[in-house]
Amino acid sequence: LRSVGPAIDVYKMIASLKPSNTNYAGTVQAAYSAYNMLSSTEKQYVTNFATLQEAKNNADSVQTVISKIAGISPTSRNYAKQVEEALAMYNSLPSAVRKLVTNYDALKSSQKEADTVDKVRQLISEINPNASNFESKLKSARSAYDKLSTQQKRLVSNYFLLEDYEAQLNNSSFFF
């Protein structure tokens, strides 16, 4: 019975794992370490080891998401892709552990910024110089672009089209 004691303690540690615990990752690691110190015979008595494995995977995934969000660079040409990937990773987490992502607010802010830039890119891509609404679409896109921060403006990959369309409009107005 004495050799079962440590196994029971580990079992209880695993049973008490709650994602709502502020030190969830540390508690998971402690339970994992305690399990690894058991003999192979004692490990057989820990019937909730699968729960520990799942908790460890979740804690590792949360840390991966936190690192991914921290690595988002607003100066990168791949900014929108970085935000999209981090958001997909966050959304793939079980809902019970999402609240453990300590920098989620930074991700939400980055997503909002990326969405704003995407809207401007979309406005520019919808401009058709042969359409009757060419000038109004051009003005809308220019207005939206001008409202962006300097940092956001750098992320508008099709800005050159906006400039080209404005040059076309200016050149065509000389002929009327």
What are these regions (language model features)?
Residues 1-176:
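Beta-rich interaction/scaffold domains
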